[in-house]
């Protein structure tokens, strides 16, 4: 953790008071499960908290930045910014990946470079920072790391297949779109989800991914491809 602390101090002027919070943020469930006798905490609860504060700060930023955009447009842009792949890229930008504590199985399966884990790590770090320093410090960090990328328009062309599918189908009439997990496989540290996308209870396509969100995006992408071939 000493090297991580040095990184945070030199790159972001962040010094944690509660070092345990920082360590927990970088501890994956697979590591905690392999060391159960030590009663080690993992980062899922911090991820939950970080997700909430991230949504709040990005929502406020977009609301003030684009006073004439409708709610739907703001929601779409926010979803692009806070999606799994985007958050994983921010973890990489911050050089967080070498410091994640992973179980042996997760490490061997390439977990250190997996978007799901890196995205969750970024949210967990925000949760830890919130508890240790407060919301304004989280805002300062995001203004340094995320907002410059948003200002450059790097999230305006991200493929949001779920939104695209919804827009196409609803343009044809009233359509209720639903996503359902139909299968889960793999160990806890390397889950794989299969999702089916339905339109008015009629199956359109399926998708597979390392997270439910990614599987849903893949299902929507496959549905769009099928519709384009009709």
Swiss-Prot record:
List of catalytic residues: 51, 123
PROSITE patterns: DS_RBD (PS50137), RNASE_3_1 (PS00517), RNASE_3_2 (PS50142)
UniProt entry keywords in alphabetical sequence: Cytoplasm, Endonuclease, Hydrolase, Magnesium, Metal-binding, mRNA processing, Nuclease, RNA-binding, rRNA processing, rRNA-binding, tRNA processing
Gene that this polypeptide is encoded by: rnc
Domain DRBM: 160-229
Name used for this protein in its record: Ribonuclease 3
Gene Ontology cellular component list: cytoplasm
Chief localisation class: cytoplasm
Domain RNase III: 5-134
Binding site for Mg(2+): 47, 120, 123
Complex and partners: Homodimer.
GO molecular function, one term: double-stranded RNA binding
Similarity comment: Belongs to the ribonuclease III family.
Cofactor annotation: Mg(2+)
Catalysed transformations (reactions): Endonucleolytic cleavage to 5'-phosphomonoester
Function: Digests double-stranded RNA. Involved in the processing of primary rRNA transcript to yield the immediate precursors to the large and small rRNAs (23S and 16S). Processes some mRNAs, and tRNAs when they are encoded in the rRNA operon. Processes pre-crRNA and tracrRNA of type II CRISPR loci if present in the organism.
Annotated compartments: Cytoplasm
Annotated EC: 3.1.26.3
GO process annotations (BP): mRNA processing; regulation of gene expression; rRNA processing; tRNA processing
Matches recorded under InterPro entries: dsRBD_dom, RNase_III, RNase_III_dom, RNase_III_sf
